[in-house]
């Protein structure tokens, strides 16, 4: 039994090591996928790997300097992280009222202001994504509380809530490392959080990606501190664990991954302890009386364990049942009958064209079937078709693309999402603007260093004979990687596992890596001294990373064309998050004026197209409907003037192509004025506006309807003339 257990443990760690190694290899060439050329001298890959080597060296050797630090230094580091987050919010970042976070928060506000606490059944997003009902209702009660205390502007409190959730996850990670390795290594983990870009990039994106972070670390920490104690203490511990597991699962279902990892770890530890006691009883030195007493204690431990497991299960089920009743109080199940089946996200995850990411065509495909059972059967059929078409080799390549998308890229899609606002803060350009090359290189270098030290930690765990507490975090990481190999591969889906990764990074620097480098140091110290010794250490690390990643980087540069980041020239809403302007704001608008300001991300002045969206198209009708004008904000020069009819508008919108010779080199705060004048007899073309008007924490341009300002988002979408590949 013990041999089987040891074999299963080694297999699990071997899979984890293999997955981490593959992601590390992909990450070493990931910097080439961001922009055509970050640095003009073409040394981007070399500089990234060299910077990663420097980070590894600082982690390995700088960690020892923190071993003598104590609690006061921990308080200082927490304050430093908090101040850095505040500085990032004020000087760099802007709110991200986009995509899923905006849909959830806007619906919560609509429930509060218009629907008397009931979810709107006409909201197609809420119809399809039932997994977000619980978090939407939580936001509803949060906004209701703010309204009751007199706070009507909810965006700042929402960001504060997000920051508190992230910092709570950091605190739980700190406590976990302190329990495993002592306060010195725990302080080193705080330094890693201070240096990690993910700590800052997603402060204004308030969604389950960040809100589930403390729940994941809470589940693992409560499992880590489990030990024999007084019965009432163990009961409190088990109830708290059950509540954290159940609520965390409702916030984001991926919380099931650390729950499974915790269960496997506790099972392995239980069986190993039972095997050790059994071997002790079988020894010739044990007296018969002691053996009988030990058997009685064993039966008592089994009974206590069964009671504790039963308590956790019962409390978890009670919390899940209560949360379901809470959702049912605000959601009429009879009206919400268009929810997607679970297999929908697996089917979408097998889409080669989107590399397993979100795909609108897949969503439309599933939505086209009336019942959930029909959706499930249709998604299964398409899933089988895609898997069969790819074959084993294509499937392996597809899994590699998904690992690259979710785990290997250092920005986790934070840079792209940070580009939606305008009137950028003073330091935005150096982090997410057109002068952010060095920050992007640093992000990728930190990701490479993190994966390298994580790999070292896993190798150290593999060499140990018994399951160490760190294995619980390794199993969580491996489970998350395998889960997103099958599931929809969102670029930001790994954010909630940042604490797990940084904990393993700290363990890698503290354990296996430190031992290896100490042995190497003995040879280096025998041949070098002073500054030469430090230079030799740096060269050894750099050469090691170059040897490991050089082939991957070279192969990528030789066999793949350069790719571009999808960057909006004018920063506004993207996608189909619009609604007809006539419905809620004006019955028959005659003149619409939309101001959009130029962003900082101009690339070689090749942006010259603007797309407008319309609703209620009538392609077979003729006659003039709208006169469209585009004026430059600086000198009011007319860059575009045309009258269009319904048959000129395609289903995906109407594209304005501004002549290149009229595009000028403009300041980052100058943009365009789009003017739509209704000249027809009836409204066959109704412009669309942003569908998140209730949030509007930071306007994406000014909208006028018949001369009156409306505090809304853009009615346009802007895109590059160049081919964009993400």
Residue ranges and their predicted role:
Residues 172-175, 211-229, 241-245, 259-263, ...:
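Specific aromatic-rich, kink-prone transmembrane helix
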Residues 1-89, 300-316:
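Start-transfer (signal-anchor) and selected internal transmembrane alpha helices
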Residues 160-180, 218, 452-459:
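Transmembrane-helix motifs of polytopic, lipid-linked glycan transferases
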Residues 157-165, 188-223, 248-261, 493-498:
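Multi-pass, polyprenyl lipid-linked donor-dependent membrane glycosyltransferases
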Residues 107-109, 124-151, 163-164:
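Short hydrophobic/aromatic helix or loop-helix immediately within or flanking a transmembrane segment
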Residues 35, 39-48, 153, 157, ...:
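Membrane-interface anchor segments at the N-terminal boundary of transmembrane helices
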Residues 168, 173-195, 468-471:
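Transmembrane-helix signature of polytopic, membrane-embedded enzymes
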Residues 114-119, 328-420:
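Membrane-proximal stem/loop segments at transmembrane-domain junctions that anchor or position
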């Amino acid at each position: 039994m013990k041999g089987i257990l040891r074999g299963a443990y080694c297999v699990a760690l071997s899979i984890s090591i293999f997955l981490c190694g593959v992601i590390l290899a992909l990450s070493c060439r990931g910097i080439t996928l961001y922009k055509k050329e970050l640095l003009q001298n073409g040394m981007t890959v070399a500089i990234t790997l060299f910077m990663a080597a420097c980070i590894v060296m600082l982690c390995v050797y700088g960690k020892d300097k923190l071993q003598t630090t104590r609690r006061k230094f921990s308080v200082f580091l927490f304050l430093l992280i908090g101040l850095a987050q505040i500085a990032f919010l004020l000087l760099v970042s802007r709110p991200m009222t986009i995509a899923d976070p905006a849909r959830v928060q806007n619906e919560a506000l609509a429930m509060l202001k218009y629907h008397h606490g009931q979810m709107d059944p006409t909201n197609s997003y809420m119809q399809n994504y039932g997994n977000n009902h619980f978090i939407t209702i939580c936001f509803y009660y949060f906004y209701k509380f703010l309204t009751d205390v007199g706070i009507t502007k909810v965006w700042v409190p929402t960001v504060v809530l997000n920051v508190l959730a992230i910092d709570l996850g950091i605190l739980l990670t700190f406590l976990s490392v302190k329990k495993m390795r002592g306060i010195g290594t725990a302080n080193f983990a705080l330094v890693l959080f201070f240096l990690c870009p993910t700590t800052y990039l997603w402060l204004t994106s308030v969604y389950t990606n960040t809100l589930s972070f403390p729940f994941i670390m809470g589940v693992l920490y409560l499992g880590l501190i489990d030990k024999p104690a007084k019965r009432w203490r163990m009961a409190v511990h088990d109830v708290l664990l059950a509540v954290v597991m159940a609520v965390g699962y409702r916030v984001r279902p991926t919380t099931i991954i650390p729950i499974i990892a915790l269960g496997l770890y506790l099972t392995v530890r239980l069986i190993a302890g039972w095997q050790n006691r059994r071997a002790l009883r079988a020894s010739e030195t044990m007296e018969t009386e002691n053996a009988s007493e030990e058997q009685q204690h064993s039966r008592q431990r089994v009974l206590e364990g069964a009671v504790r497991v039963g308590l956790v299960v019962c409390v978890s089920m009670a919390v899940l049942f209560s949360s379901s009743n809470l959702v049912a109080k605000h959601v009429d199940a009879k009206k919400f009958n268009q929810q997607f089946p679970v297999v929908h996200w697996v089917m979408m995850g097998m889409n080669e064209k989107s590399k397993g990411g979100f795909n609108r065509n897949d969503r439309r495909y599933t939505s086209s079937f009336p019942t959930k059972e029909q959706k499930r059967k249709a998604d299964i059929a398409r899933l089988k078709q895609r898997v069969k078409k790819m074959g084993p080799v294509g499937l392996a390549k597809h899994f590699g693309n998904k690992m690259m998308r979710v785990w290997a890229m250092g920005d986790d899609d934070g840079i792209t999402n940070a580009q939606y606002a305008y009137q950028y803060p003073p330091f935005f350009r150096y982090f997410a603007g057109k002068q952010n090359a060095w920050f992007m290189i640093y992000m990728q270098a930190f990701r490479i260093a993190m994966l390298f030290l994580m790999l070292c930690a896993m190798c150290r765990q593999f060499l140990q004979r018994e399951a160490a507490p760190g294995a619980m975090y390794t199993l969580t990481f491996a489970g998350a990687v395998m889960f997103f190999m099958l599931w929809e591969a969102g670029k930001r889906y790994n954010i909630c596992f940042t604490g797990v990764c940084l904990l393993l990074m700290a363990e890698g620097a503290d354990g296996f890596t430190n031992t290896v480098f100490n042995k190497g140091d003995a040879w280096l110290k025998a041949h070098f001294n002073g500054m030469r010794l430090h230079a030799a250490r740096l060269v050894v690390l750099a050469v090691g990373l170059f040897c490991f990643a050089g082939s991957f980087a070279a192969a990528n540069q030789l066999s793949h064309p350069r790719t571009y980041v999808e960057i909006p020239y004018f920063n506004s809403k993207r996608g189909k998050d619009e609604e007809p302007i006539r419905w809620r704001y004006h019955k028959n608008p005659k003149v619409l004026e939309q101001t959009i300001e130029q962003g900082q991300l101009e690339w070689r002045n090749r942006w010259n197209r603007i797309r407008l969206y319309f609703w209620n198209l009538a392609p077979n009708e003729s006659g003039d409907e709208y006169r469209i004008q585009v004026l430059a904000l600086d000198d009011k020069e007319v860059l575009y003037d045309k009258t269009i009819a319904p048959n000129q508008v395609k289903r995906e919108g109407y594209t304005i192509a501004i002549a290149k010779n009229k595009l000028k080199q403009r300041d980052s705060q100058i943009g365009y004025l789009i003017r739509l004048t209704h000249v027809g007899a009836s409204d066959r073309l109704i412009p669309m506006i942003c569908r998140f008007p209730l949030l509007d924490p930071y306007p994406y341009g000014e909208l006028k309807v018949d001369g009156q300002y409306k505090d809304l988002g853009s009615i346009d979408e802007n895109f590059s003339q160049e081919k964009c590949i993400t």
